[in-house]
Curated annotation (Swiss-Prot):
Keywords: Chaperone, Membrane, Metal-binding, Mitochondrion, Mitochondrion inner membrane, Protein transport, Transit peptide, Transport, Zinc, Zinc-finger. It is a peripheral membrane protein. Disulfide bonds: none annotated. Zn(2+) binds at C75, C78, C100, C103. It is found in: Mitochondrion inner membrane. The gene is ZIM17. This is Mitochondrial protein import protein ZIM17. Its main location: mitochondrion. Present with 1520 molecules/cell in log phase SD medium. It comes from the Eukaryota. Residues 1-47 form a transit peptide.
Amino acid sequence: MIPRTRTLLQSKIPITRYFARCWAPRVRYNVCRTLPAAALHTNIIAHNEVKKDDKKVHLGSFKVDKPKMMIAFTCKKCNTRSSHTMSKQAYEKGTVLISCPHCKVRHLIADHLKIFHDHHVTVEQLMKANGEQVSQDVGDLEFEDIPDSLKDVLGKYAKNNSENASQLPHPSQK
């Protein structure tokens, strides 16, 4: 005799057998029929095209550079200074963890998805709550903190750059 908790709709068929007989074949069939492999590609193209008189007219496309942010910090565990880049969107709307290159400890930089905290939090808020100093000024950068890929762009604003850097205007001054 099958226990009552394992039956479906007062029938004597166990739940697992019921789903195996009735639901599973239909679900597999519907998923395969409604999501062909080419449909995803076609939907993406449809946003860039408009039908006019049964002809597709290309609207155009453009490339948008994703804004990036750079962070330089000293790991409190191993006292190693490092700098990293991240997307601005991830910092403002997602969760960002950065791994220390020396000791491999992960540092929480931003948590807007509430994975680690019950509210939206950024590293700036955490440091200010602990009474630590946070600087967003490009002029506070040390030349050694800047990643090699950004030295051409940000190196001229670093404090300890060559003598030519002192003659360049600060980014806030135009």
